[in-house]
Amino acid sequence: MAELNEFLILSSRLCNFEKVEMQFVLLMKKLLYLICTFAALFALKSHAAVPEGAIPFIFDSHLYLQATLNDTVPVTVIYDTGADFLYLDEDYLKLNNLQNAFGRKGVAKMGGAGNSEPQRVEIFVDSVEIRCGELDYWNKITPIIRLRDILGRYIDGLLGNTHLLSSPLEISFSKGYLKQWEAPFPVDSLENYHKLEARFEDNRIDVKASLQIDSANAVEGWFRLDLGSGSTVSLTNEATSSLHLDDMPKAYFRTQVGGVGGGSEDVEIRAARFCMVDTFENVVIDCSLNEKGALSSGRPYLGIIGNDIWSLYDMVLDPVSSSVWVKRNGKKGTYSQSSTTHMAVFDRTDICDGWIVNGLYKGGIAEQAGIEIGDVIIAINDRPVKEISWEEQRKGLNLKGETKYTVRKANGEVVTYTLFVQKQII
């Protein structure tokens, strides 16, 4: 998800489209969906000390915000500090008949975290207004990308730094809100916060940190602050190549879609400790094998730090003074945990009746059973996955022991696999 702005407009083949009226019934359905999705969140916020003007979010490895496009169109976006502006999901537009709702289109070339060359995508070249909380932004160019192929059905779009980080931004993972502040930020209000060594360049944020793999392997330097990543720490291919990992326990992982730009390959290992303000021990990290994209070589950072680390803090990002302030928030985190099902899936019940297998660990229980990337899981222990709500997914299914997966293969055949879910992959 990092470096989503790496695109060059190749052509200005603009087509004039008449702006379509939004059908009342369609909008009501979408509004009802959003109201139901965020109802529990807003009920909680009413009891929490959320500042006036703050933007509440649901945290599910990413920060999900409710917003509105052009005053009328509901949209759920995530905040990604590895991106610049507004991006919209292709299936969100198609399923809601919004393909031509935001004016003229052009073509762009765009890269990202995936392991492939930059790809051609459609863009809206007319400005799109987005309202997020009490904040209004006009987005000049809006790429149309396949975000749901990366994160699943509950994402409609993505919002980057150009809009949300135009002034000091408070991010409270403990209370679930963002809040923009006027500059200068009142530093005297940051009691118990720690200031990180940081740099703000090219609309991105890097911080200093160190990673000790074992007694023979360590890296120290700049890491990208990436709220668009749900992982702990992901090293670039170049940083990975500098290490001696041959004798270390490791798990090979590959995905069909690892980010904008295609699939990805990496190895997971356990690092002895990761040090920033605090020291985290026994951390599961990713070591990229990608030859292209944001985690390849030649990058001005050693890797990216994702939300498995940042969610343990409340933060203030201040682009005016190029400062990052953090305070531990009491959460224990999952940075020492790795997969027990040995596969990665995402919910695509918006377009089919199941969860699509997007990633597999080499030699893991899922691969050994016969599950393949691209398979559609339609039931777990005879329970249709369409019945499993987003809230239940966020809490975790806590699968243990003998577990039956009913799967639809690429040829349409329905097969049941039995996995014994117990051990972490690494």
Which residue stretches match the model-derived regions?
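Bacterial Sec-dependent N-terminal signal peptides
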Residues: 7-15, 21-52
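Pepsin/retropepsin-fold aspartyl endopeptidases
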Residues: 47-426
